[in-house]
């Protein structure tokens, strides 16, 4: 009920959305700053019918295989190796760390609205090609055409204006650069989401409904999520179950029942700058 009330407030007061999410993630980062094993908060990705070991991970990364798999799925939509990459909404830094260590961009920057999350990430993930800083997804603190790739994982639903986010991504991408993008929406919000993508001035290169993959990941990962919630939340473990998407709670039920959908997209800034109203070319990727 508490989680539902929080989401109800967010949906009806977009002007408060940024402040409420920042307060929540500041609280999480401060309360759990000593818990180094929890570095990713997304719902994960798994291929139904495939073994959990379908790609290699270092032993230390294995517990977060499913959230890492979501980053891997989105990151592999276009090359990142040797490129300048920005993650908008880097959270506790685990996704940016995975990309920096496994995919090896020239430069990896993780940006998050929560200063406390940035402090945690900077302390937890130390690498020469990885840097974290605080900033707003709708006012990216970077010069025009600073990055070859931008990645955004399960974060944009928090933003007051998705249009401003897309405009900022378009601004900081170099011509021909990619936005690797994945998120979820309630079923009745999907059409408006598609319209926002269509008017972004970014070309839609690939799109995939990964709802079954996220449902599968949440099912497989529920024992870890449930156990982690009891370790860190104690008497509030039930609320932690809702927040982390344990089987039987609201988000997995909506996803499995068709009330919510989860998509991944690859978008591209036109190789030669074009007006925002330029037509969008698209094809579906299976």
Task: Tell where the protein language model's regions lie, with residue ranges.
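A short SAM/SAH-binding and catalytic strip from SAM-dependent methyltransferases
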Residues: 149-160
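Conserved Class I S-adenosyl-L-methionine
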Residues: 212-272, 280-286
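A short acidic, Gly/Pro-enriched loop at the edge of an enzyme's catalytic core
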Residues: 138-150
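A short glycine-rich, Lys/Arg-flanked "PGG" loop and its adjoining helix->strand segment in the class I
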Residues: 163-175
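N-terminal auxiliary segments of SAM/dcSAM-dependent transferases
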Residues: 1-40
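Conserved alpha-helix/loop element of class I SAM-dependent methyltransferases that forms part
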Residues: 64-81
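Class I SAM-dependent methyltransferase SAM/SAH-binding core
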Residues: 86, 92-139
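Conserved beta-strand signature within the Rossmann-like core of class I S-adenosyl-L-methionine
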Residues: 177-183
């Amino acid at each position: 009920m508490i989680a539902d009330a929080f989401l109800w407030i967010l949906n009806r007061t977009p002007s408060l959305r940024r402040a409420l999410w920042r307060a929540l993630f500041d609280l999480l980062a401060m309360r759990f700053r000593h818990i180094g094993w929890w570095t990713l908060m997304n719902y994960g990705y798994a291929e139904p019918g495939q073994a959990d070991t379908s790609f290699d991970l270092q032993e230390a990364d294995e517990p977060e295989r499913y959230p890492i798999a979501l980053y891997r799925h989105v990151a592999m939509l276009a090359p990142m190796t040797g490129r300048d990459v920005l993650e908008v909404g880097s959270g506790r830094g685990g996704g940016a760390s995975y990309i920096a260590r496994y995919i090896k961009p020239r430069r990896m920057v993780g940006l998050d609205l929560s200063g406390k999350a940035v402090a945690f990430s900077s302390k937890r993930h130390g690498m020469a090609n990885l840097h974290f800083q605080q900033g707003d997804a709708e006012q990216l603190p970077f010069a025009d055409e600073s990055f070859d790739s931008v990645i955004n994982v399960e974060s944009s639903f928090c933003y007051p204006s998705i249009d401003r986010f897309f405009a900022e991504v378009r601004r900081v991408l170099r011509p021909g650069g990619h936005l690797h993008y994945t998120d979820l929406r309630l079923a009745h919000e999907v059409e408006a989401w598609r319209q926002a993508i269509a008017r972004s001035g970014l070309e839609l290169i690939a799109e995939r409904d990964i709802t079954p993959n996220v449902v599968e990941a949440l099912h497989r990962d529920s024992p870890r999520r449930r156990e982690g919630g009891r370790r860190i939340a104690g008497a509030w473990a039930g609320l932690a179950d809702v927040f982390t998407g344990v089987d039987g709670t609201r988000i997995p039920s909506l996803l499995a029942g068709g009330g919510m959908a989860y998509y991944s997209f690859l978008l591209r800034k036109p190789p030669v700058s074009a007006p925002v109203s330029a037509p969008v070319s698209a094809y579906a990727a299976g």
